[in-house]
Amino acid sequence: MRKIILTGDRPTGRLHVGHYVGSLRERVELQNSGAFDDIYIMIADAQALTDNADNPEKVRRNVREVALDYLAVGIDPAKSCIFIQSMVPELTELTMYYMNLVTVSRLQRNPTVKAEIQQKNFEASIPAGFLCYPVSQASDITAFKATHVPTGEDQEPMLEQTREIVRKFNDIYGEVLVEPDIVLSTNKACLRLPGTDGKAKMSKSIGNCIYLADSPKDIETKIMSMFTDPTHLRRDDPGHVEGNPVFTYLDAFSTDEHFAAFCPEYSCLQEMKDHYTRGGLGDVKVKRFLNNVMQETLRPIRERREYWEAHLEDVQDILKAGCEKAENTAAKTLSEVRRAMRINYFEDGNLLK
């Protein structure tokens, strides 16, 4: 079986470091590994409209921002197909067919959907499109017969819902669709990076993010104001590293080379953690080290973004070519689905016979 990746992001804002360690960094590594036959990376504008229907300009504007972020982190259009969801109409048709294979109660039980409904205050009035977006995700994944989906752990319920739809479709109509596997980062700190305010999740809407496109000054300001251990009031106080966002970020980003370059009194992160835990290490010093780490990590990303911002016509050409390739692939899958469902009425000329 061909090994195929499908992944993507909603264009509701610029991408942040949570996206980077949660999936973007992994995507670049997978892209460059040569282990996959095809890689599709989707800008999910149609999905973004499920809770931004009254603000389409926001979605339109951020299609550009997400495309620039993809290219900035190292997504290579020669190796990965970057496309816009709404420019592949076959996905909408597949969604309609799949909606007959899932119940409303099952959609309401999806933990990811339940959490997002609460976060967006949709309890009293849930847009139908928002409730059904797991079905749309199933269409996105199966249209390209994706075998692997790199994403965050909070999306596992979505992948399981896709697998359920695939199994039900194949059971009724025959073996057409492929069940996908999730690809998670091996670094546990990367699975869900907390916000700079200590909240469990970094969120564009809450504003507790460090963006990939942030200036050096903005990065420094956000890091130096980060939440830490509230019981660590003085430098000599014993501190806690568990649940401390500064150390969670260091888990996700720092390397021994960073210590050699910026904090040579420690050979590795564990030595710094041990010192902080027993007392004698202040938060300011730890934050300054984290700032050096983040500046070095984000500098090349920001420089590549500036290059592509100066070549927007090339970015548009990349997106157009990606959409054409994605539509051709999705059309083939849709044809197989119609044939399996016996709704390919004029394909063989036997409709009325």
List each model region and its residues.
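N-terminal amphipathic alpha-helix/helix-capping segment at the start of soluble metabolic enzymes
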Residues: 1-2, 328
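Residue-level "edge-of-site" marker
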Residues: 83, 149, 351
